[in-house]
UniProtKB/Swiss-Prot annotation:
PANTHER family: RIBULOSE BISPHOSPHATE CARBOXYLASE (PTHR42704), RIBULOSE BISPHOSPHATE CARBOXYLASE LARGE CHAIN (PTHR42704:SF15)
Species of provenance: Bambusa multiplex
Keyword hit for Cell wall biogenesis/degradation: no
Domain of life of the source: Eukaryota
Known cofactor(s): Mg(2+)
Protein name as annotated: Ribulose bisphosphate carboxylase large chain
Modified residues (N6-carboxylysine): 190
Residues that coordinate or bind Mg(2+): 190, 192-193
PTM info: The disulfide bond which can form in the large chain dimeric partners within the hexadecamer appears to be associated with oxidative stress and protein turnover.
Annotated positions of the N6,N6,N6-trimethyllysine modification: 3
Gene Ontology MF, one: magnesium ion binding
Name of the gene: rbcL
């Protein structure tokens, strides 16, 4: 029975007649094979290398049931308009993955295979997470409805502001900027993603001044205010220590950079936040390293799905209109994946699989990066009510300074929401609506 030697992957791992199971994790890869490598072989190689395969036939294959555990490439289609590029669909049996570990899921699916010689490039476009697997994750600490109830804010997007200059302010001046923005009418202020604990502002001092800012603004406005305290740190222990301190100060929300911090750290923090009533704001620093290339890497919708499983209440999702990249339909596709329970397959929006999250709470998308008051009508229309709109320079860059900048954003937002509720067309009349709002 046993013959050593190298053999074609497609003999074992390309199974076009396979019927996918409801418990399978399905992946859609954009495969660019090297010249001369047939697409079936390339697709099968991806399935093999990300599941049970190795480059040769091994004796120990006889000790397990490959049919039960192997990944299968079950469908291949050419990409329209691209030469020698294919979408390969791969099904992975549920047993290949550890329960409740995004880290393990990614190690399996994208761990090794991206350096594969037979491929010129490889991109993971989408994943279908079966409910049997997603149920092993706790997901977002609270979710959209709970957050609205905690903050007592309904029927409009939330407003945030990243404190700039992002690096260099002392703790006290930082807190002062927070206070002015919150007092002016924003719901949240935010630590920038790279504000952790540097020599010019240590985390504990910053947190104390920011908490003071929030309480003072809360007392004066009668609205609940929050500052995203960035708990990202060099070790998981230090990260939790910062989150504990935020809780002791009574802060409503903390923040984490989930890609640089890592999924393991992020999931730990999400569990802590759920147990202690903290909201969790997620920044996606480093995402473009992974998702910006069209032919290689991973699409952000995969990172977004992973975050919903790992846990976070807000996540940055591009703006469609600001300084950072993001196409409208694709962005709305993964915004729905973050917020909704059930998302239909829709290739025009980049959604390769129907995804059913069942009862897993949703994540609020955050639009942030180079947006300002004149983008407000577009943002209100694109993102709808369940979103956070964040204006950093768009608040602090106001010629009359921070509080008026914040007030301008709040007035513009309320005007846009009111106009929308009256049935006006924001896309067409947006500028007028904002001009009229300036007058009061």
């Amino acid at each position: 029975g046993f013959k050593a030697g190298v053999k074609d992957y497609k003999l074992t791992y390309y199974t076009p007649e396979y019927e996918t199971k409801d418990t399978d994790i399905l992946a859609a890869f954009r495969v660019t094979p090297q010249p001369g490598v047939p697409p079936e072989e390339a697709g099968a190689a991806v399935a093999a290398e990300s599941s049970t395969g190795t480059w040769t036939t091994v004796w120990t294959d006889g000790l397990t049931s490959l049919d039960r555990y192997k990944g299968r490439c079950y469908h291949i289609e050419p990409v329209v308009g691209e030469e020698n590029q294919y979408i390969a669909y791969v099904a992975y049996p549920l047993d290949l993955f550890e329960e409740g570990s995004v880290t393990n899921m990614f190690t399996s699916i994208v761990g090794n295979v991206f350096g594969f010689k037979a491929l010129r490039a490889l991109r993971l476009e989408d994943l279908r997470i079966p409910t049997t697997y997603s149920k092993t994750f706790l997901g977002p600490p609270h979710g959209i409805q709970v957050e609205r109830d905690k903050l007592n804010k309904y029927g409009r997007p939330f407003l945030g502001c990243t404190i700039k200059p992002k690096l260099g302010l002392s703790a006290k001046n930082y807190g002062r900027a927070c206070y002015e923005c919150l007092r002016g009418g924003l719901d949240f202020t935010k630590d920038d993603e790279n504000v952790n604990s540097q020599p010019f502002x240590r985390w504990r001092d910053r947190x104390v001044f920011c908490a003071e800012a929030x309480y003072k603004a809360q007392a004066e406005t009668g609205e609940i205010k929050g500052h995203y305290l960035n708990a990202t740190a060099g070790t998981c222990e230090e990260m939790i220590k910062r989150a504990v301190f935020a809780r002791e100060l009574g802060a409503p929300i903390v923040m984490h950079d989930y890609l640089t911090g890592g999924f393991t750290a992020n999931t730990s923090l999400a569990h802590y936040c759920r147990d202690n009533g903290l909201l969790l704001h997620i920044h996606r620093a480093m995402h473009a390293v992974i998702d910006r290339q069209k032919n290689h890497g991973m699409h952000f919708r995969v990172l977004a799905k992973a975050l919903r499983m790992s846990g976070g209440d807000h996540i940055h999702a591009g703006t469609v209109v600001g300084k950072l990249e993001g196409e409208r339909e694709m962005t709305l596709g993964f915004v729905d994946l973050l917020r909704d329970d059930f998302i239909e397959k829709d290739r025009a929006r980049g959604i390769f699989f129907t995804q059913d999250w069942v009862s897993m709470p949703g994540v609020i998308p955050v639009a942030s990066g180079g947006i300002h008051v004149w983008h407000m009508p577009a943002l209100t229309e694109i993102f709808g009510d369940d979103s956070v709109l964040q204006f950093g320079g768009g608040t602090l860059g106001h010629p009359w300074x921070n509080a008026p900048g914040a007030a301008a954003n709040r007035v513009a937002l309320e005007a846009c929401v009111q106009a929308r509720n009256e049935g006006r067309d924001l896309a067409r009349e947006g500028n007028e609506i904002i001009r009229a709002a300036c007058k009061w």
